A protein has these predicted regions:
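C-terminal amphipathic alpha-helical interaction region
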Residues: 1-100
Length: 100
């Protein structure tokens, strides 16, 4: 399900204008990283559970649980940001940064 969500979001981003895609690029990279690492942790926990080392399996599962509960929720914020248009980013004129 996580990989499918990432794929569907990637298809949405692919359809963006170049400006909107560029505006969300950093959030897309963070979103992708968190999602794909989540998939890897699910896979590692599953592989370890099928092995013959219960201590390793418990450690992998606990680390996977930590990732899911503490880090994976960050995807929601990055996804929300990357799906926004570049309007607020482009609304600031160059001279509006002149503070001197």
């Amino acid at each position: 399900a996580l990989l499918d969500e990432w794929y569907q979001t990637s298809l949405q981003v692919k359809a963006f204008s170049p400006v909107d895609a560029a505006a969300g690029a950093c959030d897309y990279l963070a979103y992708s990283g968190y999602c794909l690492l989540g998939v890897l942790w699910y896979s590692m926990a599953d592989c370890a559970a099928q092995g013959d080392n219960p201590v390793l399996a418990a450690g992998k599962q606990k680390t996977c649980d930590f990732y899911i509960q503490r880090l994976l929720p960050r995807t929601a914020a990055h996804k929300a940001a990357l799906l926004e248009s570049a309007d607020t980013l482009l609304a600031i004129a160059g001279n509006e940064f002149d503070y001197l």
